[in-house]
């Protein structure tokens, strides 16, 4: 998919897509499209505005489904929104695998993506640096031009083919009640793979780094960029 899940084309220049906690299906409140880390105004089916609820501590899968607009944050270990550890929320055939891999992802009922799309495998982002490793040296970033609210990554090998723009949507931090951080400066995108009982594999970047093998706490709210099934 050429844009993050839930992207709003009314304000294409700025980050404005919703965030997801690892393994959850429901989107959480996006930023308002500015770089001020401000929540977007939400409206219910009656047209009345409301704010995203924030609840400390872990909850069950069922509780999270019944409360789709609630951010469940954690300030102590384990840093997971769920009171039970699962490894296959976004890949039905994952089992208990936690290592980086390029295994086939089988979509689950918890996958937030539309028909025809699914979560990417953990290795999906490794083409964004020269050797697939976490990089702080700009010459090893597989990008075109300079950082501008995100990176234009090459998509067909090292410095080859067309580019895709990946926005720096910021993230919701698990350790601060799900508050927005670094909108327009940092980008974090989940993969389908867990890296442990507390963390998930993700892509993390800003102007000075590209980490295709990053690990983020599952209770964080990151962006989602799906791939075709």
Give a label for each model feature.
Residues 1-87, 123:
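A short glycine-rich, aromatic-capped structural motif
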């Amino acid at each position: 998919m050429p844009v993050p899940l839930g992207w709003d084309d009314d304000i294409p220049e700025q980050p404005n897509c919703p965030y997801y906690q690892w393994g959850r299906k429901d989107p959480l409140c996006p930023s308002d499209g500015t770089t001020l880390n401000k929540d977007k105004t939400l409206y219910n089916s009656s047209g009345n505005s409301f704010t995203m609820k924030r609840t400390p501590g872990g909850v069950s899968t069922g509780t999270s489904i019944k409360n789709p607009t609630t951010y469940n944050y954690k300030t102590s270990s384990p840093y997971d929104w769920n009171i039970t550890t699962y490894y296959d929320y976004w890949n039905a055939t994952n089992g208990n695998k936690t290592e980086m891999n390029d295994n086939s992802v089988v979509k689950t009922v918890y996958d937030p993506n539309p028909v025809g799309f699914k979560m990417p495998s953990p290795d999906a982002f490794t083409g964004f640096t020269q050797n697939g490793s976490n990089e702080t040296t700009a010459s090893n970033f597989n990008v075109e031009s300079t950082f501008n609210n995100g990176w234009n990554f090459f998509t067909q090998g090292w410095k080859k083919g067309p580019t895709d723009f990946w926005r720096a949507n910021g993230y919701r931090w698990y350790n601060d009640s799900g508050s927005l951080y670094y909108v327009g400066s940092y980008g974090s995108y989940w993969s389908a793979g867990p890296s442990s009982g507390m963390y998930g594999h993700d892509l993390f970047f800003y102007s000075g780094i590209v980490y295709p093998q990053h690990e983020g706490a599952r209770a964080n709210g990151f962006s989602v960029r799906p791939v075709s099934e």
